[in-house]
A protein has these predicted regions:
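Acidic/Ser/Thr/Pro-rich low-complexity tail/linker regions in eukaryotic proteins
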Residues: 1-454
Length: 454
C-alpha cells in the first residue's frame, strides 16, 4: 500500500533491481506493452489480470493529483476532491501487510487530495481505525455509498457489519455500475450513529430470500480462457469449467421453479436480464453497445445449451452432442495441425463430457459468447436467489435463505441484511430484477422504518 503513495506523490520515480535503474514511467510503458501482447496470445501466462490490479490504483491517484497541480499552477480554483468512498474503493485494490496501513498508508495522499482523516494512531485496533474511516466517509459525503464495499470474508475481529474490510477488495459493485440504478428513487440518505458500533438508516423491507443457488463462481483463470486452437487441452479444462457449468445449470433449475414473474415478464426473460444485471436495457456492456436482437439470440442459445436435458423444452443431450460433434469439435486434420500428441490424447479424454460440449456450444457463436462473457463478469462471486415476492436477483455469496432484502434511502441498490439480536447484520448489495428503478419504494416517507446495522 505504501508504494501507491510513493508513486502518486513522487515527482520523479525510479525502480531499482540490483545495479539496474529504470524510470517508473518506462516500466509502466513496458508492462502495458507486455499486457497487450498477453491479451493477444498470452505467451507469458496469466499476466494481464495481475497487471491491471497492480498498476491501475497508483495510476488513478497520479491522475487526480496531476489534474489538481495543473489547475493550481494556472491559478484555477481547486477542484472538488473525490469522495472518500470512491478513493477507498480504488485503494482496496492494493494489499497492506499491516492491515492498519490500508488506511494509514494513503494518509498523506488523501491529505494532498484535500480529504481529511483522523490522525494516524497505531495504538488503535484495526476495527477501530476502519470504523472511524467508514464513519468519516459517511459524514463527509453525507451519504451511505461506503456500504457498497461491505461484502468480505470479515477477517477483522469486532468489525461492525456496516464497516468494510479496507484491506480486502471485493469488487462486487464498481461505482460506475451503481449509478445506473435507483431502487430508492431520488431519495436522500437519512442516518444516525447510535454509538461506535451501530448505524441506523431509513429504509423499507421488501421481502426475503426463500431459495438460492449453491455453487458460486470464483475468480479463476477461466476468465482468461479462450476457445481457440492454441489452448491447452487437458484435465485442467474440466477443473476450470466444472463450477461454471454446475452454476449455470443450478440457475436454470432455480428459475424453473417460478411459474410467472411479478413484472409480467416471462420467467426466461427475467432470468436473461437478471444474470447480466439488465445491461442491454441500460445500453451498456463493457465498452460495447448491445444489439437487443443479438442479445436475445445470445441468451436463447446460451440457455438451450446450459439447460440441455433438464426441461421438456430444452434440447436433448443427444442433440447437443450431435451438433457439437458435427460442427465444433476439431477434425483429425485440425488435430494433427494444432495439437501435440499429448494434447490429442487429452482432448479425447474430455470431449465426451457434458462440460466440454456445453463450453464448445457457448464459444461457437458471437452473440452466445458475448452473453456468456457478461454473465461470467456479473455473476462471479454471486448467488442467484428467489425472493418471497417471486423476484429473481443476485447477491453476495454470504447471503442465506431467510435473509431480508431492504431498500435504503440514498442508496441505488437493495441491500441484504440478516437479523442479529436487536439489529441487522449487513451482508451487502444486491441486484433484484424488477425493483431496481424504484418500483417498490414507498410513495410517502411515513411508510419507511429505521433499520439498525450492528
Amino acid at each position: 500500500m505504501w508504494t501507491v503513495q510513493e508513486v502518486a506523490l513522487g515527482r520523479y520515480k525510479i525502480v531499482m533491481c540490483g545495479s539496474r535503474i529504470l524510470p517508473w514511467d518506462e516500466l509502466v510503458f513496458g508492462l502495458e506493452t507486455v499486457s497487450i501482447q498477453e491479451n493477444v496470445g498470452r505467451p507469458w501466462g496469466d499476466f494481464e489480470g495481475s497487471f491491471g490490479a497492480s498498476i491501475s490504483c497508483p495510476a488513478f491517484f497520479e491522475s487526480l493529483l496531476r489534474r489538481r497541480r495543473m489547475l493550481e499552477k494556472h491559478g484555477a480554483p481547486r477542484p472538488k476532491p473525490p469522495t472518500l468512498s470512491v478513493v477507498l474503493f480504488e485503494a482496496q485494490r492494493q494489499k497492506a501487510t499491516e492491515p492498519k496501513d490500508a488506511i494509514y498508508g494513503i494518509y498523506s495522499l488523501l491529505s494532498a487530495l484535500g480529504i481529511d482523516l483522523p490522525t494516524p494512531d497505531y495504538s488503535k485496533s484495526v476495527a477501530q481505525i476502519y470504523s472511524e474511516t467508514a464513519r468519516t466517509a459517511i459524514l463527509q459525503n453525507n451519504g451511505l455509498e461506503i456500504l457498497y464495499q461491505v461484502p468480505s470474508s470479515r477477517k477483522v475481529d469486532n468489525l461492525p457489519s456496516w464497516v468494510p474490510d479496507f484491506n480486502e477488495h471485493n469488487g462486487h459493485y464498481p461505482y460506475w455500475k451503481v449509478e445506473q440504478f435507483s431502487s430508492s428513487r431520488k431519495s436522500t440518505a437519512k442516518f444516525e450513529f447510535k454509538d461506535k458500533q451501530k448505524l441506523s438508516v431509513l429504509g423499507k423491507c421488501v421481502g426475503s430470500i426463500i431459495s438460492r443457488s449453491e455453487t458460486v463462481i470464483g475468480w479463476t483463470e477461466a476468465e482468461e480462457f479462450e476457445f481457440t486452437h492454441n489452448m491447452d487441452v487437458d484435465a485442467g479444462f474440466l477443473t476450470i469449467f466444472e463450477p461454471y457449468v454446475k452454476a449455470y445449470r443450478e440457475w436454470c433449475e432455480l428459475a424453473g421453479t417460478l411459474e410467472s414473474y411479478p413484472t409480467g415478464q416471462s420467467v426466461l426473460g427475467a432470468l436473461c436480464h437478471t444474470l447480466v444485471h439488465d445491461e442491454p436495457q441500460r445500453k451498456e456492456a463493457g465498452d460495447q453497445k448491445w444489439d437487443i436482437k443479438s442479445f436475445a439470440r445470445g441468451f436463447s442459445n446460451w440457455h438451450s445449451a446450459v439447460s440441455a436435458g433438464m426441461f421438456e423444452y430444452s434440447m436433448t443431450l443427444d442433440f447437443l452432442s450431435g451438433v457439437v460433434e458435427g460442427k465444433y469439435l476439431p477434425n483429425k486434420k485440425s488435430l494433427d495441425k494444432f495439437f501435440s500428441a499429448d494434447d490429442r490424447k487429452n482432448l479425447e479424454a474430455v470431449k465426451d463430457t457434458l462440460i466440454y460440449k456445453i463450453q464448445a456450444w457457448l464459444h461457437a457463436h458471437e452473440p452466445t459468447r458475448t452473453y456468456d462473457y457478461v454473465v461470467q463478469t456479473r455473476m462471479r462471486t454471486s448467488r442467484l436467489v428467489i425472493t418471497s415476492e417471486g423476484y429473481m436477483g443476485t447477491t453476495p455469496p454470504m447471503a442465506k435463505v431467510g435473509d431480508r432484502i431492504v431498500l435504503v434511502a440514498g442508496l441505488s441498490l437493495p441491500m441484504i441484511v440478516r437479523r442479529e439480536g436487536e439489529g441487522d447484520r449487513l451482508i451487502g448489495p444486491a441486484y433484484i430484477h424488477g425493483i431496481m428503478d424504484g418500483e417498490r419504494w414507498p410513495e410517502v416517507e411515513s411508510d419507511l422504518e429505521w433499520i439498525n446495522f450492528v
